[in-house]
Curated annotation (Swiss-Prot):
It is a single-pass type II membrane protein. This is Inactive dipeptidyl peptidase 10. The chain crosses the membrane at residues 35-55. The lineage of its organism: Eukaryota, Metazoa, Chordata, Craniata, Vertebrata. May form oligomers. Interacts with KCND1. Interacts with KCND2. GO terms for molecular function: potassium channel regulator activity; serine-type peptidase activity; transmembrane transporter binding. Belongs to the peptidase S9B family. DPPIV subfamily. The modification Phosphotyrosine is found at residues 138, 143. It comes from Homo sapiens. Pfam families: DPPIV_N, Peptidase_S9. Signal peptide: none annotated. Residues 1-34 are cytoplasmic.
């Protein structure tokens, strides 16, 4: 732990001596006026020196209550952000996990709390995940949890009776000590579903025998109710590929067939005499994709499974399913997307007959975004709401709320737009039929923030910001979750200050209850020297693009500072936001007085489709140009040291950082890339094809987008490459190909390998990763003090 040394400044002012004039015989005559003036001047000089010392003394020496943020701090318990995992059980009850680990039920109307599970229960069963049954009688506890991909994990489970404390192991029939791919409660009573060996099992209640709903499951080939790698990472953004009807009587699920998909082998190097490999289906750009089918199974009475068919125009072509949602107890809405990702069709299917009708079709000249969005339906299904791109003059298209009215007899649809403007609707949260209001999150107040709004669906469409006045000094970035009947909502303040979770009444949002304040983290941060970020706006090609500078707390613009530029991990993401952030780069700012910059150029999200889709067929081109323009702007600032510039990126961010480092603009002294994508042909089909098309038709586009060409440009920079050998997202193959080309070009590099670690390293390796990155940038960016040659002493 770095300690701040205590420094004291001693200034000694001595009175001048009285000097007799030599050669004078007359008695000494004192010039009292002159002496007084001289003493006054000396006192003024002493005062000025003392004042300047105080002013120039760093803050940590004058304010002992604040200390610098260290890497060790990030791993302390009081620096952990607590997520209460709050969820609605019904319209008045919320279940959440308190900061001390108890699972509690809160009634929002009476403020009465009920302890459902003590924190010691987690210790007893070594459980790290929990889920409370809908009837609040049982808890599902997961232990021996092992992460598979980004969202998926395997675990063993026990069922715990809250009242009697009885415990049951959850196992498939005739199997003991099973490891399950998934387990969760249904929507009614004690319904249970779990997935074992890629097959779905169902229990009507905890005392009943398990019923196997599918039998086609085959490891790494046929997936039932659970996603394969491509669907989990790039399409559903979840490992869950099944959906309950509201009454719990039916289950919709995907069957993903990877039998023709090429497989990737991930070797495991440690822990055995001979390394073993994990083999799993991973379609790269242009390769065979998984095929997909959507089924609905009836859970009551004789088990009956029905397939829901794609639209006619998709039956003879490759497609994805990106969204499934129940509209009523028997109807589902499904979104089908072609492989090129520029045509999507929304259908509503009657699951008793299998009949599906097309409700809306979207097309794009580039690609379609927001394809996971779930439409919000009225109870009778006569209208639904979702966001669609709407043109806003020269600024291009922005996502806005549209209301779709279905004519019952003709099945024709009338569309009415409820919002408009140069801002984005992020998500539609709820529709209250009593008040005829729609609730949604938007960027209307600021593209960097998220506020909760309501809008009337009738008459003048009056729009109102619900969250704008809630803790406005602390919160400008929100998410929300409404209760089943929309009478109450959970409000999640996610920044810029320490996150807070609160409960509100929809009728009177100003009345609230704080569920989680993260007070421990708040107190810990108050003791640290953490500065506030500054926002600057850059004008590039008629776009206004945001640049964020995170400055040291004791920043002074007359000093010179090193700069670290951080890249985003995904296209369509957003780095410059009001979200709370504290990570390894916060330590670099504090400990090494480095300025950290983040810039959302073309290809970034939530600023309209025109900015986002500039990267179509130009991945690795316009983003590089914009980031370099941002750096050149920063170099005009007097406090940026042009000789101490650095860059960092992970995944796609590592790809952009590599493209910048090898460009003709030699701006950076060093750079670090973690798990960098180096060739889009080696990456996932759904990702690469979305932005660049099929390799067979776009060979030159893929060549231009590759890091592996002209790597001679990396000769002048100091580069650190970091990669886990078990990365299932960006395979180690990417770094291996890059290193091969660097060696051929005679480029020096530093490599940090994490054996058997994935795309996100485990907790046990995180400290080492962070310290490696920090040491690299600290060494690279430290101020070079030129030592003047010592002059030889002259002989007397």
């Amino acid at each position: 732990m770095n300690q701040t040394a205590s420094v004291s400044h001693h200034i000694k002012c001595q009175p001048s001596k009285t000097i007799k004039e030599l050669g004078s015989n007359s008695p000494p005559q004192r010039n009292w006026k002159g002496i007084a003036i001289a003493l006054l001047v000396i006192l003024v000089v002493c005062s000025l020196i003392t004042m300047s010392v105080i002013l120039l003394t760093p803050d940590e020496l004058t304010n002992s209550s604040e200390t610098r943020l260290s890497l060790e701090d990030l791993f302390r318990k009081d620096f952990v952000l607590h997520d209460p995992e709050a969820r609605w059980i019904n319209d008045t009850d919320v279940v959440y996990k308190s900061e001390n680990g108890h699972v509690i039920k809160l009634n929002i109307e009476t403020n009465a709390t009920t302890l459902l599970l003590e924190n010691t229960t987690f210790v007893t069963f070594k459980a790290s995940r929990h889920s409370v049954s809908p009837d609040l009688k049982y808890v599902l506890l997961a232990y021996d949890v092992k992460q598979i991909f980004h969202y998926s994990y395997t675990a063993s489970y026990v069922i715990y009776n809250i009242h009697t404390r009885e415990v049951w192991e959850l196992n498939p029939p005739e199997v003991e000590d099973s490891v399950l791919q998934y387990a969760a409660w249904g929507v009614q009573g004690q319904q249970l579903i779990y997935i074992f060996e890629n097959n779905i099992y169902y229990q009507p209640d905890i005392k009943s025998s398990s019923l196997r709903l599918t039998s086609s499951g085959k490891e790494e080939i046929i997936f039932n109710g659970i996603a394969d790698w491509l669907y989990e990472e790039e399409l559903l953004h979840s490992h869950i590929a099944h959906w309950w009807s509201p009454d719990g009587e039916r289950l919709a699920f995907l069957m993903i067939n990877d039998s023709l998909v090429p497989t990737m082998v991930i070797p495991r190097f440690t822990g055995a005499l001979y390394p073993k490999g994990k083999q799993y289906p991973y379609p790269k750009a242009g390769q065979v994709n998984p095929t997909i089918k959507l089924y609905v199974v009836n859970l009551y009475g004789p088990t009956h499974t029905l397939e829901l068919m794609p639209p006619d125009s998709f039956k003879s072509r490759e497609y994805y399913i990106t969204m499934v949602k129940w509209v009523s107890n028997t109807k589902t809405v499904v979104r089908w997307l072609n492989r090129a990702q520029n045509i999507s069709i929304l259908t509503v299917c009657e699951t008793t007959t299998g009949a599906c009708s097309k409700k809306y079709e979207m097309t794009s000249d580039t690609w379609l975004s927001q394809q996971n969005e779930e439409p919000v339906f009225s109870r009778d299904g006569s209208k639904f709401f979702m966001t669609v791109p709407v043109k806003q003059g020269g600024r291009g298209e922005f996502h806005h709320v549209a209301m779709f009215l279905i004519q019952s007899k003709s099945e024709q649809i009338t569309v009415r737009h409820l919002t408009s403007g140069n801002w984005e609707v992020i998500k539609i949260l709820a529709y209250d039929e009593t008040t005829q209001k729609i609730y949604f999150l938007s960027t209307e107040s600021s593209p960097r923030g998220r506020q909760l709004y309501s809008a009337s669906t009738e008459g003048l469409l009056n729009r109102q910001c619900i969250s704008c006045n809630f803790m406005k000094e602390q919160c400008t970035y929100f998410d929300a979750s409404f209760s089943p009947m929309n009478q109450h909502f959970l409000l999640f303040c996610e920044g810029p200050r320490v996150p807070v979770v609160s409960l509100h009444s929809t009728d009177n949002p100003a009345k609230y209850f704080i569920l989680e304040s993260n007070s421990m983290l708040k107190e810990a941060i108050l003791k640290k020297k953490i500065g506030k970020p500054e926002i600057k706006i850059l004008h590039i090609d008629d776009y206004e693009l945001p640049l964020q500078l995170s400055l040291p707390k004791d920043f002074m613009d007359r000093n010179q500072y090193a700069l670290l530029l951080i890249m985003d991990e995904e296209p369509g993401g957003q780095l410059v936001t009001d979200k709370f952030h504290i990570d390894w780069d916060s330590v670099l700012i504090d400990m090494d007085n480095v300025i950290v910059a983040r810039f959302d150029g073309r290809g970034s999200g939530f600023q309209g489709l025109k900015i986002l889709q500039e990267i179509h067929r130009r991945l690795g081109s316009v983003e590089v140009k914009d980031q370099i323009t941002a750096v050149k702007f920063l170099l005009k600032l007097p406090y940026i040291d042009s000789k101490r510039l650095s860059i960092f990126g992970k995944g796609y961010g590592g790809y952009i950082a590599s493209m910048i480092l090898k460009s003709d603009e030699k701006l950076f002294k060093c750079g670090s890339v973690v798990a960098p994508i180096t060739d889009l042909k080696l990456y996932a089909s759904a990702f690469s094809e979305r932005y660049l098309g099929m390799p067979s038709k776009e060979e030159s586009t893929y060549q231009a987008a590759s890091v592996l060409h002209n790597v001679h440009g990396l000769k002048e920079e100091n580069i650190l490459i970091i990669h886990g050998t078990a990365d299932t997202k960006v395979h180690f193959q990417h770094s291996a190909e890059l290193i091969k080309h660097l060696i051929k070009a005679g480029v020096n590099y530093t490599m940090q390998v994490y054996p058997d670690e994935g795309h996100n390293v485990s907790e046990k390796s995180k400290y080492h990763l962070y310290s490696t990155i920090l040491k690299f940038f600290s060494d690279c960016l430290k101020e070079e003090i030129s030592v003047l040659p010592q002059e030889p002493e002259e002989d007397e």
